[in-house]
Amino acid sequence: ARSARPFLHATAHPDLALRAGVPMQPAGTTLQPASLIFMLGGVDTDALPMLRHSRQGVNYHDLAIREALEALREREEVPLFGGPWYCGVLTPGVVLVNMTRTQADMADNREATAAECLLHEHVHLFTELLRRHVPAFRNASLLATATQTGVRETRRIRGFHTLTGEEYLHAVDFPDAVSRGCHPVDIHSASSTGQRCEFLKEAAFIPYRCLIAPGFPNLLVAGRSFSADAVASASVRVQASVMGLGQAAGAAA
């Protein structure tokens, strides 16, 4: 056993809180999928509309590549994908690609390991598909993958207050607000290529009560495992928002 005046839990999976007995939110029907980002070189970036992704409602992705992949799914095996989204870097001919996805409980070591292996296979498969079917990627080669699979959703604690999507989208101003969020509510489907993306009309507020649970006054939980429903979490889960929660938890401690 370990004792301390404050414990700050800012990891992706609230294992400490779980082992201490903090109640968790119900997982719901499905978790958002995990994705592995990869980097390609040899791309004809002059022919690729790098910063001009098609906008369909509020979803930004390369519509031409998406339609080509959807057509391919009808006659050959194409893994589940999202987007695709890509962005350039400072090196000409190099792009970062976000398109892989798989459903898994990434808080479970066995499922996480299986997902990691599967997504690395999909990276190679998608690289070959892009080479064969998208002219700008004809000479592309795989340069790197992310150090590990990106996880959008696992466990969340049940705190003194559970931030709801309704409160978040309407920017309810809480008296104990400690941080704000402005990223869209971004929910990726784990069973299709779909995505729900809803932009905020104004920056949302996140209350301190979402970082602590009844009966655990010296444990602060920051990051995407804070107390929120699936809709609010789908916005706050990104880097800038969770950094704000970490700063708030550190100041409170």
PLM regions with names:
Residues 2-252:
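Flavin (FAD/FMN)-binding glycine-rich loop and adjacent Rossmann-like elements that form
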